[in-house]
């Protein structure tokens, strides 16, 4: 199977946002991002046709590391149906408060049973986060995500990469911001976040050559923040 080598590029604000995507949906969005020219002008993507991306079952199969394209296409059709209703949330600090911006990922989707491919059309509102990028951006190869089994792991990689200096980095994040950024269930208590989100993700990352540790910080008796220290392979 041919290796994936296309790059996913997005502004840091998007990498650190709340995506509200399942793993199958994330694979489709990330694959579509590799087909966007991150250096192109926003005007180049004003036209709906330019924002419409085709993804075939072979591409999805490589990212998910599935055994066959039949399973890949099944997952793609199911995810495409859900994607039309998904929004990302970006928090931005103003002079007096913190505002939340909600943006739909896609405005339309199309697939034909048995065709082996789907089409998605990114919304115009999301394009400023995907193109005309000169600085403050997150970049990684799609092949780095091939076979990832948890959306938490994928989102942690994006978050840490957005704060990396070269291959290394250190960043402190509040428990609540970490919860929303990694799509962790609201019902999870702090102990659950550590045991069911962070530890499995670290295990998966270490198998991929990452060196990563985290420290817990308390406010009073409660763990309120986490500090991650990492080195990418």
Regions found by a protein language model. Name each.
Residues 1-233:
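Charged, alpha-helix-forming regions
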């Amino acid at each position: 199977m041919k290796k994936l080598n296309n790059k996913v590029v997005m502004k840091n604000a998007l990498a650190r946002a709340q995506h509200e995507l399942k793993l199958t949906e994330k694979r489709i969005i990330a694959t579509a991002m590799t087909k966007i020219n991150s250096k192109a002008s926003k005007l180049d993507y004003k036209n709906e046709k330019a924002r419409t991306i085709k993804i075939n079952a072979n591409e999805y199969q490589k990212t998910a590391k599935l055994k066959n394209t039949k399973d890949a296409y099944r997952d793609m059709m199911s995810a495409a149906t859900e994607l039309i209703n998904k929004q990302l949330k970006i928090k931005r600090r103003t002079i007096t408060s913190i505002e939340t911006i909600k943006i739909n990922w896609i405005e339309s989707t199309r697939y034909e049973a048995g065709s082996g491919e789907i089409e998605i059309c990114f919304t115009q509102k999301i394009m400023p986060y995907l193109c005309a990028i000169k600085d403050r951006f997150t970049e990684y190869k799609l092949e780095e995500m091939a076979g990832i089994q948890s959306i938490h792991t994928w989102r942690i990689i994006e978050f840490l990469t957005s704060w990396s200096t070269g291959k290394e980095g250190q960043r402190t994040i509040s428990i609540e911001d970490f919860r929303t950024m990694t799509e962790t269930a609201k019902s999870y208590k702090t102990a659950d976040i550590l045991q069911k989100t962070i530890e499995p993700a670290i295990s998966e990352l270490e198998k991929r050559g990452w060196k990563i540790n985290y420290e817990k910080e308390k406010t009073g008796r409660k763990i309120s923040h986490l500090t991650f220290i990492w080195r990418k392979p």
